[in-house]
A protein has these predicted regions:
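N-terminal "pre-motor" subdomain/linker immediately upstream of P-loop NTPase catalytic cores
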Residues: 1-129, 139
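Conserved glycine(s) of the Walker
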Residues: 135
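Histidine-centered active-site/metal-ligand motif
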Residues: 19, 27, 146, 154, ...
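Switch II of P-loop NTPase G domains
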Residues: 103-107, 182-187, 205-211
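P-loop NTPase switch/communication element
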Residues: 120, 126, 141-196
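Conserved P-loop NTPase nucleotide-binding/switch module
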Residues: 32-35, 161, 193-229
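Alpha-helical segments flanking ligand/cofactor-binding loops in enzyme cores
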Residues: 8, 116, 145, 190, ...
Length: 229
């Protein structure tokens, strides 16, 4: 698969993104600079083949209904990847985001020490905001792993898609992916309290209902983390 070589290239170059669109070569983004990988112009049928190889039958059906698909997966010895498949001007486009395989420690990210204190709180709402590519996902993963390493309890995440995979350490970590482990955001957030979490991650607050749920979790004695664009 052409993506196998691209994944390897992303890891070697520490690239953040790959862009695959019809009518132009595949582009790679390295340290904020976007450039073509080669001179081969991608055709719609070439991209469609790549997209459908990435999706399961269930994901294919959902994509054909909504024309949008988010998915993630890990490649051994390379890392984790988040993929967005969408339509533009009548053809399929793909954007791949490279996510480091190992969750970095908070101290390695040169972040304010207060983040380590916040993630150990018993209750409250912590919002991580920033532009695309600013490190929101990595920051939250590092915070959650800090709690996982240092406090017993139950951490529940609701994500679309799952980006970092956590190991059970002092805490039990249950990760739910929209479309795979739960029908939709509404169902996952409605049932979260029945799963007795101490700490909840809402992968992204996208609407009023998700924000209301986050506030309700914090007000009922839980620590809730979420991202906002």
């Amino acid at each position: 698969m052409i993506l196998d070589k691209l994944f390897q290239l992303m890891a070697e170059k520490q690239a953040s993104d790959i862009f695959i669109s019809a009518g132009t070569p595949i582009h790679i983004k390295i340290q904020g600079n976007t450039m073509p990988v080669n001179q081969q112009t991608m055709l719609p049928d070439m991209i469609e083949k790549i997209a459908y190889e990435l999706m399961s039958p269930e994901q294919t059906k959902a994509f054909e209904a909504t024309m949008e698909m988010n998915l993630s997966f890990g490649v051994p010895q390379i890392g984790n990847f988040r993929v967005n498949i969408f339509r533009q001007r009548g053809s399929i486009s793909i954007v791949v985001r490279f996510i480091l395989g190992n969750i970095p420690q908070l101290s390695a990210l040169d972040l304010p020490p207060v983040l380590g204190d916040l993630i150990m709180e018993k209750r409250g709402l912590v919002l991580i905001v920033g532009a695309t590519g600013s490190g929101k996902s990595t920051t939250i993963a590092s915070m959650l792993d800090h709690r996982n390493t240092n406090r017993a309890g139950h951490i529940l995440t609701v994500e679309d898609p799952i980006e970092f995979l956590f190991k059970h350490k002092k805490s039990i970590v249950n990760q739910r992916e929209i479309g795979m482990d739960t029908l939709d955001w509404a169902a996952a957030l409605k049932n979260a309290m029945r799963q007795a979490p101490d700490c909840i991650l809402i992968g992204e607050i996208r609407d009023r209902e998700a924000m209301a749920a986050a506030l309700a979790y914090a007000q009922t004695g839980h620590l809730c983390l979420a991202t906002l664009h």
